[in-house]
């Protein structure tokens, strides 16, 4: 469950290392984001010379959360960290690589490019 002011690690090679959530997209009163949801965030920590700088406002999709999520088959999925991947306005990832596993819920939300780049889909 990601909400305003939540900090997330970045799971791609755009150069950003940490994000701070500004807003959860998808409705005026939407409070929480889970795997596959889109957020607006600001870059809090970035590598020097990277494509994004500290203070940039970016869109990102959540790929891992520490809060467990119930799947339709009854299983629960939970990760060790909160992580996101930076995306363009069209929904394609800004980076060319994705690090670590991502949730299967991304397939339902039509983020197929992220699924294809990820090393593991859980």
Curated annotation (Swiss-Prot):
The gene is rplN. Keywords: Ribonucleoprotein, Ribosomal protein, RNA-binding, rRNA-binding. GO terms for biological process: translation. The keyword Ribonucleoprotein applies. This is Large ribosomal subunit protein uL14. It comes from Thermobifida fusca (strain YX). GO terms for molecular function: large ribosomal subunit rRNA binding; structural constituent of ribosome. The keyword Transport does not apply. NCBIfam families: rplN_bact (TIGR01067). InterPro entries: Ribosomal_uL14, Ribosomal_uL14_bac-type, Ribosomal_uL14_CS, Ribosomal_uL14_sf. Part of the 50S ribosomal subunit. Forms a cluster with proteins L3 and L19. In the 70S ribosome, L14 and L19 interact and together make contacts with the 16S rRNA in bridges B5 and B8. Pfam families: Ribosomal_L14.
């Amino acid at each position: 469950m990601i909400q305003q002011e939540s900090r997330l690690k970045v799971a791609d090679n755009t150069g950003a290392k940490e994000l701070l959530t500004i807003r959860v997209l998808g409705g005026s009163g939407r409070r929480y984001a889970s795997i596959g949801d889109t957020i607006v965030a600001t870059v809090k920590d970035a590598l020097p010379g990277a494509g994004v700088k500290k203070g940039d406002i970016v869109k990102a999709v959540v790929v891992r959360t520490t809060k467990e999520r119930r799947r339709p088959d009854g299983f629960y999925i939970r990760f060790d960290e909160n992580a996101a991947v930076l995306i363009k306005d069209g929904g394609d990832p800004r980076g060319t690589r994705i690090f670590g596993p991502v949730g299967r819920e991304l397939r339902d939300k039509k983020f197929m490019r992220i699924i294809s780049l990820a090393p593991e889909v859980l």
